[in-house]
Amino acid sequence: MSSIRLYNTLTRKKETFEPLEPNKVKMYVCGPTVYNYIHIGNARAAIVFDTIRRYLEFRGYDVTYVSNFTDVDDKLIRAARELGESVPAIAERFIEAYFEDIEALGCKKADIHPRVTENIETIIEFIQALIDKGYAYEVDGDVYYRTRKFDGYGKLSHQSIDELQAGARIEVGEKKDDPLDFALWKAAKEGEISWDSPWGKGRPGWHIECSAMARKYLGDTIDIHAGGQDLTFPHHENEIAQSEALTGKPFAKYWLHNGYLNINNEKMSKSLGNFVLVHDIIRQIDPQVLRFFMLSVHYRHPINYSEELLESARRGLERLRTAYGNLQHRLGASTNLTDNDGEWLSRLADIRASFIREMDDDFNTANGIAVLFELAKQANLYLQEKTTSENVIHAFLREFEQLMDVLGLTLKQEELLDEEIEALIRQRNEARKNRDFALADRIRDELKAKNIILEDTPQGTRWKRGS
């Protein structure tokens, strides 16, 4: 039996993870609508579920990871009209930008990245099957899902039909039978991109796309379906209704949702002018700092984005990289074996066990990072020993590399620009002036790990790059 426990939105409790097939995991993550660059809220979902995939692979599971692109949609059509470009041209540009952004953030590509426009036939067949079973109906070229016919509607978002009915409205121009019904196929409007179908020219509704593509690439029932908390209702609720009405089987065994991201304690929105695009931020900071920041809070909890918290994340990542760099520098000056190798190797085994225990508990990356800080602390303690062993140093390095890789974090030391070095020296001088010697020493160690040598003189601090 697996020791991994995860929180299932469907049941609102932590459950032991038992995939449908032993050692195989089928995972579907809702991807972006590609009409613009992704924002840092999208980035949180990408980073969180990439990390969960990495951890499952680390624990020996064979993961098939599917994440879609919505490459036709109202937003894309509007963007095409505003920019005077075609929908496919805009989609292609932002799919390319998406791959650049997530690669910078340390996310691996999905095994399959299906696009809606490449799966129109599959979607049409799915809709026709729902019509044949009485779960959908056509009105003047539009096709709607008959929501009340599906008994389990509301089970994911834990809402009753009566509660949902109270807030439902029929928009002007809609001809559906019930305010709760939603569109599976939208009849074409003049000048819009469209495809031929049994109901005339049109395009798919948003919700049906994921149901059809998840089934095509992963089968009737998948292990994990994941996405942002904002997708729970109506998107994921509607996916369940569509898929389970068609197959009569559970659509997904486990539903995972990451929490919201706020900016300086306010919801991120274009109207507030606090909308942060990944494309912009990764040109200002090390993208790995953004990833570290996202993983420093449990994935289900809300996270607050601010300059101060980003700086704290930068310091945290630097602390780990510095400890790793110090170990590397000691390699040539160590002996083959020492008397206390066994004790240190035992400590390392305990650290790995702690990391696994924390990550097994609903992928708690925040506590996983705390374990990495303990690893850094033990590394620094070890380097204070009179004699060190290459055997133990290599074991420390391996733990750093493997556990950091699970979190998608790199240990590569970026070469500092001259201005960055000068800024750190000014920060160190300020710390010394304020008698914060711990901070001053930490900055000096950070620079030393990046091969920057400081010399304090009566005229001020000088620096040079080591050979």
From Swiss-Prot:
Principal subcellular localisation of the protein: cytoplasm
Residues where Zn(2+) binds: C30, C210, H235, E239
Subcellular location: Cytoplasm
Cofactor binding remark: Binds 1 zinc ion per subunit.
Nucleotide-binding recorded as keyword: yes
Cofactor(s) demanded: Zn(2+)
Catalytic reactions on record: tRNA(Cys) + L-cysteine + ATP = L-cysteinyl-tRNA(Cys) + AMP + diphosphate
GO MF, one annotated term: ATP binding
Root EC class: ligase
One term under GO cellular component: cytosol
Family annotation (Gene3D superfamilies): Cysteine-tRNA ligase, C-terminal anti-codon recognition domain, HUPs
UniProt motif ('HIGH' region) ranges: 32-42
Keywords assigned: Aminoacyl-tRNA synthetase, ATP-binding, Cytoplasm, Ligase, Metal-binding, Nucleotide-binding, Phosphoprotein, Protein biosynthesis, Zinc
Family named by the database record: Belongs to the class-I aminoacyl-tRNA synthetase family.
Oligomer status and interactors: Monomer.
Protein name as annotated: Cysteine--tRNA ligase
Organism from which the protein derives: Geobacillus thermodenitrificans (strain NG80-2)
